[in-house]
A protein has these predicted regions:
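A short amphipathic helical element positioned immediately N-terminal to and/or at the very start
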Residues: 1-8
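Single conserved hydrophobic/aromatic residue that forms the stacking wall/gate
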Residues: 310-317
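Hydrophobic C-terminal alpha-helix "anchor/cap" residues
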Residues: 7, 89-90, 258-259
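Mid-to-C-terminal secondary-structure elements
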Residues: 103-281
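Short, strongly hydrophobic transmembrane alpha-helices
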Residues: 12-40, 48
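Alpha-helical transmembrane segments of integral membrane proteins
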Residues: 17-27, 296-308
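Membrane-helix entry/capping segments
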Residues: 9-10, 262-300
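Membrane-proximal extracellular/periplasmic loop immediately following the first transmembrane helix
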Residues: 34-122
């Protein structure tokens, strides 16, 4: 009681210390709360798996290359060359699956959108144009627990795939997805049937709900083969998954093969990117932000006993 009376009697002289402690407490509470929410979000399933996966950055030879082919010398389109490249990749003993996509691969930061009507709801999900093997490469999981195979088959049947979280949380109508039809708002002649439903697919490890609704539409080979001058290698995502146990030197091995075995027409592999590196580079800003918050939390935790020591020393005097 004597200590409390002394603190009360000296409340004016100790006011700045108590104010400092209050500010520290408020800021610390904010940082701890932010850290908890961020950590909980980070460890939630992302809906895909990038283990043993690679992205192949493609490019074209220019007329200064000794092996460059002019338009008169070429008998194939760029789309045909890309398909031939993926077929050669599939024949490699280390490769499990290869996919072609556009604005669809994880951690890309580049998107395509669609405006679709399903029942009475108009939604604007991300549009992911992919070949069926995309789901095998990145291990999307069917909402019914049967793995990626139902999603692969859905695209092969000419249907589309959506995530199980396609409906807004406040939607009161029938929340069934499988078998329903969606109409393109901009072109009512385009009608898509939902043939597969995946588990929720997040945009990255740090965003809980942003851009996590999507519709996957098949990118048919018959359309690819017709594309030439209007197609740019940088807009084509060739990704692959290697078999478990494959050497970590696979990217280097692939680049050695690219000179002779994997060069098609003027198309060649410019670089092979390990997907773990893509993930880290894409999220580097978020990692830095987390690091700064941890330093702040450490500083504030250190500041509390220092302020308390100052307060006790002042009370002793």
């Amino acid at each position: 009681m004597q200590l409390l009376k002394q603190i009360w009697n000296e409340r004016r002289s100790n006011g700045w210390l108590w104010s400092e402690l209050l500010i520290v407490f408020v800021v610390l509470w904010y940082v701890v709360d932010w850290t908890y929410v961020t950590a909980r979000t980070y460890y939630e399933p992302v809906g895909f798996d990038i283990t043993d996966t690679y992205y192949l950055e493609l490019s074209l030879k220019n007329d200064k290359s000794n092996s460059y082919l002019s338009k008169e010398q070429k008998s194939t389109s760029l789309g045909q060359d890309i398909i031939e490249l993926t077929n050669r990749l599939r024949r490699l003993p280390e490769v499990e699956a290869v996919s072609i996509s556009n604005n669809a691969r994880p951690y890309i930061g580049s998107n395509s959108g669609s405006m679709l009507r399903i029942d009475t709801l108009v939604s604007s999900p991300l549009r992911r144009s992919v070949t069926p093997d995309f789901f095998q490469v990145f291990r999307y999981q069917s909402a019914d627990g049967r793995g990626y195979q139902p999603l692969v088959q859905a695209l092969r049947n000419g249907n589309v795939v959506v995530g199980e979280n396609f409906w807004p949380k406040d939607y009161k109508g029938d929340r069934t997805l499988l078998g329903k039809e969606m109409v393109d708002v901009d072109d009512s002649t385009k009608v898509y049937k939902i043939g597969g439903v995946s588990k929720k697919v997040r945009y990255n490890d740090f965003w809980p709900n942003y851009s996590d609704r999507y519709v996957a539409i098949e990118l048919p080979e018959k359309i690819m083969v017709e594309l030439d001058d209007e197609l740019y290698p940088s807009s084509v995502e060739v990704c692959l998954r290697v078999k478990p146990g494959t050497s970590r030197d696979f990217a280097e091995h692939l680049m050695k093969l690219s000179v002779n075995q994997l060069s098609v027409g003027n198309l060649f592999i410019l670089k092979v990117h390990d997907y773990e590196d893509i993930r880290n580079d894409f999220q580097q800003e978020s990692y830095n932000q987390v690091q700064v918050r941890f330093w702040m939390m450490g500083f504030l935790l250190l500041n509390i006993p220092v302020s308390y020591t100052h307060l006790r020393a002042h009370e002793t005097r």
